[in-house]
Swiss-Prot record:
Species this chain originates from: Pongo pygmaeus (Bornean orangutan)
Protein known as: SCAN domain-containing protein 1
Compartments it resides in: Nucleus
PANTHER family per UniProt: PROTEIN ZBED8-RELATED, SCAN DOMAIN-CONTAINING 1
Keyword entries, A-Z: Nucleus
Limits of the SCAN box domain: 108-166
Region: Disordered, residue numbers: 1-108
Keyword Nucleus set for record: yes
PROSITE patterns: SCAN_BOX
Length: 179
């Protein structure tokens, strides 16, 4: 313990104390031993000296340019936040103003009306759009064909003339894709 007291005094932290080896440990079988004439490669770097324990190694701290070039495909902004399944279920079953459940049309409108300035960065915008699309398209209960059908119908409504769109919307209330 006497050997670790100077390290504690120098660093002020017991976490920086290297683990003590048993006194009977042989140095010839220890792969971490840096013995003269040993043919074994050194497994770990030598322990830093007590005076340099609190000094950061410049090579270990990446510069912003190095970090950007190492991962250019990552979107910028805050890290994604996972949504609890319970909160997801509550959002789907939240009653509307008349006490009924919100329908796919409500979630479609929320998805389409979402704007980037509503989010705190690209990652958060992506997370929110993904959540809104899942609430609208419900991939957990709908087939791929049903989801494609919903997307095609929406695109058709977007390109139809106003009169045809009004007729289609009136008929649309009777049609409901259920899962």
């Amino acid at each position: 313990m006497a050997a670790t007291e100077p390290i504690l005094a120098a660093t002020g932290s017991p976490a920086a104390v290297p683990p003590e080896k048993p006194e009977g440990a042989g140095s010839s079988s220890d792969p971490e031993c840096n013995c003269v004439g040993s043919s074994l490669p050194e497994a770990s770097p030598p322990a830093p000296e007590p005076s340099s324990l609190n000094v950061a190694v410049p090579e270990a701290i990446p510069t912003p340019q190095a970090a950007a070039s190492a991962a250019p495909e990552l979107p910028l902004g805050p890290a994604p936040v996972s949504v609890a399944p319970q909160a997801e279920a509550e959002a789907r079953s939240t009653p509307g103003p008349a006490g009924s459940r919100l329908g796919p049309e409500t979630f479609r409108q929320r998805f389409r009306q979402f704007r980037y300035q509503d989010a705190a960065g690209p990652r958060e915008a992506f997370r929110q759009l993904r959540e809104l699309s899942r609430q609208w398209l419900r991939p957990d209960i709908r087939t791929k064909e049903q989801i494609v059908e919903m997307l095609v119908q929406e695109q058709l409504l977007a390109i139809l003339p106003e009169a045809a769109r009004a007729r289609r919307i009136r008929r649309r209330t009777d049609v409901r894709i259920t899962g």
